[in-house]
């Protein structure tokens, strides 16, 4: 071939950049360099670019070629060049005559997918080069002393890898790189935050994340346009830290996965946002806790009971209403023997039972209906027991019966300084057919809310905000007041909305709107997790806002304020965040919601022999605002190799760094605000799953929607096991359903549009039930994939027993 080559160089090859290279090491980025060869006779090498998956060289090489010449360009990791595989990262083979006419001349920009070599190592990414017959301009490499060429045939096969000068190999599968990479930007401007779009604007499914840290291809388009043209006024295109494209609407300070249409209409967009917000508001207002579920403030429970129960014989509609609310009927006729009616100085009637020498607010002629938890004949979880107060006898020592302002009976235990809806003279409704975890949660809740530190102080705390400026106004109002003032009765007033509310509906609306605003990724304080696009985690790059620590303290105060005043926030965090709030140690399982790829790599490291396969040290590479630095996981860590003996310690330290250490400043600021209202020793009575419910409440889950958007593997919907599964779920109350949702998906959060929008770690992922496991084993869950591994249990009773144990007794969020 050499005899057919011209005597002088006739083609200039510019190796511009590579994009989205494969990251073979868990925490170490490669040091890429490129080697260009023609027929094994001419070899040129670029400089080494340190610690990157997207190296930029822009180096020129002049070659002697003909139309049949094969140009081969390989990329290697300089750190591993002396290893067996030489740190191979990919190759392209280009036949010169296929891309440029040497006789006519020309200039061609090429973007080619990197291919595998003969050893079949995994390869990702693209290589961008330029071929030109114009050699009249000076070679900038030669001018800068960077041109390292070997014009004679290589005699050292160990120095430069041998390349098969054949036609390009077929791609091993669909290209993993961004198809828009044909016009790469050589100096892309990256937004320093790694935020992700909020699903609260236009609920949409984000595309799957590129695998193994691959970033989307950079183009020479500005951030205000994309391949479809220029974005509407006020819109910007960004990319999150998983390479997913999202769009920022600066007009409304919101984000979305969905590209705005070219005929974007602000009025239409506003209407869509309002409709979406109304759906979320309705879902938020339906959330409750177990203690609330026994009260008249639980509309969903009342509705369910009205459907599940019929009035007693001879009963009326008012009797059904009484059963749903726990109220009493008006007494008529004479008082029973030994009873007397008296009046307090304030004019309130009460009744004296001289038979037992006790007093009560309740007219003994009234009939009280007591709500009892347990299984009835129909298999429902709630039954109503009718019991005349006069037949119950006296209250135990130290107990008192009182009425709420809606005439509902409750009981005060002065021995423990607690209150309860449950009549102590009846068999405990907490212990009849109620799962252990539920007894524990309800008792914890009663204990928690009865503590002196959680009692509302005398006086009022006035907060006035504007709806369209709620974040800034709330920050100013809440941060100017002392913690003791915030513990007074909270009176929320929206500017321009006069009316007497006593803080009830306004408080609920206030926390709903504020939680939507302050957790919006637009502000770079929080970002959506790797698991989905609706659970939150602290943004490690929140320092882009110089006041971020003050804002985290404010957010901590708001979360504490919501718990203190028994309101819910419309936001849900990764499981590890709740663990951190309880000062619990995070584990490898918690990594699933933060970085699914890293979780998989670390799990593989623990389960396999790594000697001679993976070269790691006790150090990690971290990039912050474009600067990459090496962080020691322990003193001198970068010089300590990871071995089979110490890999367990390595995994623990990596997990601690990735989840806790990177956001330690922000989290400590958050907790300083939170603990001003909620003492740490009190909140620690809950576990992490209960804390999620305490902050966000328990959702009213639509089982029909859940079932409709479920896939099956190994099962069919008509199988008896599946029929029994849904039958059991329908009989469970809202809390048990939320626990099941936590067990299988990692959160009790349901997307605004229902289960059809359920997300996994790799994009949209429907709830899935897979036939897996021995009938003697418990069900298992894969929270990253919203999957439940359900063994083929023989009977309904066995299925319910096994499922209940798995859901109730399992700690943590991820099971695998």
From Swiss-Prot:
Its EC number is 2.3.2.26. Keywords: Cytoplasm, Repeat, Transferase, Ubl conjugation pathway. GO terms for cellular component: cytoplasm. Residues 134-238, 253-353 are annotated as: Disordered. The active site is at residue 784. Gene3D superfamilies: 2.20.70.10, C2 domain, Hect, E3 ligase catalytic domain, Hect, E3 ligase catalytic domains. Residues 229-262, 333-366, 393-426 form the WW domain. Residues 1-112 form the C2 domain. The keyword Ribonucleoprotein does not apply. Residues 310-333 have a biased composition (Low complexity). The keyword Transferase applies. It is found in: Cytoplasm. It is an enzyme of class 2 (transferase). Residues 482-816 form the HECT domain. Pathway: Protein modification; protein ubiquitination. Its main location: cytoplasm. E3 ubiquitin-protein ligase which accepts ubiquitin from an E2 ubiquitin-conjugating enzyme in the form of a thioester and then directly transfers the ubiquitin to targeted substrates. Probably involved in the regulatory network controlling carbon source utilization. Interacts with creD. This is Probable E3 ubiquitin-protein ligase hulA.
